[in-house]
């Protein structure tokens, strides 16, 4: 889970709260070679427990975990706004997560900036989004 960029096909809060990413936006984002596809788990806690992490991976097949995406996905879903999540993963969600976050926070920023610029260009030139 560390120092990578994930384009999330879905955001999973628990079995009842699963938000699918917009397929067109996800396809456009995943055209960038610096992005890997995955499932994003999300919750109201900083994931540092290895057993809890293993449980999320086994139950939901997640690639990464964060604390914000479910709220954003929920608002988008309720308002009918296409949703996509691109995440810079900064730690392995284990007992060393706090230290890893500090060390790796800037490692993927340039790549994420490039992915976003490329995605915005693809969105603006994608006929399927404008017709």
Residues covered by each model-derived region:
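A short acidic, glycine-rich active-site loop
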Residues: 13-21
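Active-site-adjacent substrate-binding region
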Residues: 22-90
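Single conserved hydrophobic/aromatic residue that forms the stacking wall/gate
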Residues: 1-7, 11-12
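Gly/Ser/Thr-rich active-site loops/lids in small-molecule metabolic enzymes
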Residues: 8, 61, 65, 105-112
